[in-house]
């Protein structure tokens, strides 16, 4: 399996709301045309009010998330304050530039300046944005986001849009499927929703 095949699967979405950020993914992991795992975790909490999604090689993604968690903890010990989302985006960019991680990630969270979101690709380039999607199912997810998203929505409204976007990708992209992961970050912290809670959100679509 080559590196391009590693990057084929996955759909993730993220966007900024008036009171925080919403992140969502599906859970299918593929190796070429094989569904290797139906419950792959692509949503991570890397600090109290910072989350990330990943698309790409699983081992690289797990390694990158572990490094970011360690760097954030070290920063807090040294500086006695939280790392900003902007600083974390720069740090992640430098890590990606220093070695070949075949990972595309969305970093998002809430800091003293409010809610922020960045998309980073394997080359280390990083882009601030209000909404985005990554992975093979992203064209379908973007269709929903372009139609439903606006910067005035709350996270309560955003949860439904995120699940709708992931559902659209799962219905059309063979590399995306199985289950959902949903996280909401506000000034109070990050909440990762259970399957039962997500099922209730789906009923409202």
Curated annotation (Swiss-Prot):
Highest rank taxon of the organism: Archaea
Tagged with keyword Transferase: no
First-level EC class: hydrolase
Residue ranges the record assigns to the propeptide: 1-9
MF term (GO), any: threonine-type endopeptidase activity
HAMAP family, A to Z: Proteasome_B_A
Protein family per UniProt: Belongs to the peptidase T1B family.
Subunit structure comment from the entry: The 20S proteasome core is composed of 14 alpha and 14 beta subunits that assemble into four stacked heptameric rings, resulting in a barrel-shaped structure. The two inner rings, each composed of seven catalytic beta subunits, are sandwiched by two outer rings, each composed of seven alpha subunits. The catalytic chamber with the active sites is on the inside of the barrel. Has a gated structure, the ends of the cylinder being occluded by the N-termini of the alpha-subunits. Is capped at one or both ends by the proteasome regulatory ATPase, PAN.
Name assigned to this protein: Proteasome subunit beta
